[in-house]
Amino acid sequence: ISLGADPGVAVKAACHNAARYFLLNNRGAIAPGYLGDFVIIDDFQHFEIEMVYKRGVLMYDGQLRDFPAPEIDPYLVKRAHDTFHVAHLTAEDFSDGRPHAVIGMIPGEIVTQDAGYADHADPEQDILKIAVIERHKNTHHIGLGYIKGYGLKRGAVATSISHDSHNIIVVGATDEDMAAAANRIVENRGGITVMENGQVLGEVTLSIAGIMSDDSLVMVNSALEDAKDEAFGLGVSRGIDPFMTLSFMALPVIPSLRITTRGVFDVSSQRYI
């Protein structure tokens, strides 16, 4: 809109068209048969939200309104908080004495490139070890590889948000910190951890299935921003999101190289390398 687009066309593109694309056919408009999820804004210049409606019920008008929380089966609640089945990890779990493919990150992109092979981490040359640990069935499957372009100089970063299987993915300068970071994720029943010399520098706890939190939005966002700052402090490249970028390294459908619990996968040739 600030670049001259018609406000009605821009809002339709963002709301109605996007919902149609994802087959969310009862969202994206205010009309009979739609859910009635919408926001009221002040104007088309500032887009400050004044009211929020969910299924036609006012939820926010400057302050959050009380609303009945949906009831959830207690058994499902218990299961959602018990999704980590992983044996204690040690530095030896992250070292098999073999060379592995190097995933080359591209700044500003989630696609990657083949950056050759490496047989050890070399943070000064921006070569770091990367691993994915299976965490659902206690199989002890751990895929190993290397990554270039992440920028970390010390410590390790781990997260249980790793599309789409949401295993534990960890990048580190040392095997010891990688093991410590992954163990911390298991201890917290999910989340994000930034670790150095066995000490937690920053973390976000995501104890619901390892990908969600029952803390407030403000608390989670504050912890996330603090963890990002700590990751940048360890050398992570400022041009990337330390955690979002890492999460997509485990999605083996986006070219070129990704990592799974079985190792580095070449998406283009559909084989492990």
Segments (PLM) and residue ranges:
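Active-site microenvironment of metallo-dependent hydrolases
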Residues: I1-I273
